[in-house]
Design a protein with these regions (language model features):
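Generic secondary-structure transition motif, activating predominantly at the C-termini of alpha-helices
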Residues: 34, 77, 81, 104, ...
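Intrinsically disordered, low-complexity segments used for protein-protein interactions
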Residues: 8, 12-16, 86, 120-124
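Extended intrinsically disordered, low-complexity coil regions enriched in Ser, Thr, Gly, Ala
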Residues: 47-76, 105-120
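Amphipathic alpha-helical binding modules
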Residues: 87-136
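Short terminal alpha-helical segments
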Residues: 5-60
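A ubiquitous short alpha-helical element
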Residues: 14, 61-62, 81-86
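Short, low-complexity cationic-aromatic patches
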Residues: 33-47, 82-101
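BZIP DNA-binding basic region
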Residues: 1
Length: 136
């Protein structure tokens, strides 16, 4: 009787580290999202940085690093709801720069597949709750 050779099953839970090139590109994207919100405040710039912070938290980045940025983003959002415009105060700009620098220094700790999954989950959530997208 023949026995089929079984291949070892793929273990998706293995933590694949982020390669330097990927980490550097992501660090640049995070810093540029922060600078974009600071330099040219807009709803789009706010949403880009907000989704990045959400994905990083979902991927397991320390909330101690992310919490100051989340507080600033909440303050910006509250101000937008009060007066209808996105603006970033100088002390908020400083705090956002500090947070993006801390994120930059910590990105190497996040496994690549965990980050990729977190980005997909945040993007899916954003599409589901976005009132501007309509199905025709």
């Amino acid at each position: 009787m023949f026995h089929r050779h079984r291949r070892p099953s793929f273990k998706a839970r293995v933590n694949v580290p982020m390669v330097t090139e990927t980490r550097d590109r992501l660090a640049l994207e995070v810093r540029m999202a922060g600078e974009s919100l600071i330099g040219h405040p807009s709803i789009d710039a706010y949403n880009v940085l907000s989704k990045m912070l959400a994905a990083l938290e979902r991927a397991g980045m320390s909330t101690v690093l992310l919490h100051p940025g989340t507080r600033v983003m909440n303050t910006i959002c509250d101000r937008y709801e009060e007066n209808g415009s996105i603006s970033v105060a100088p002390e908020e700009a400083l705090r956002l720069r500090q947070v993006t620098a801390a994120i930059d220094a910590s990105l190497h700790r996040i496994p690549l597949q965990r980050f990729a999954l977190a980005v997909a989950e945040v993007e899916t959530f954003a599409v589901v709750v976005d009132p501007t997208t309509s199905k025709e």
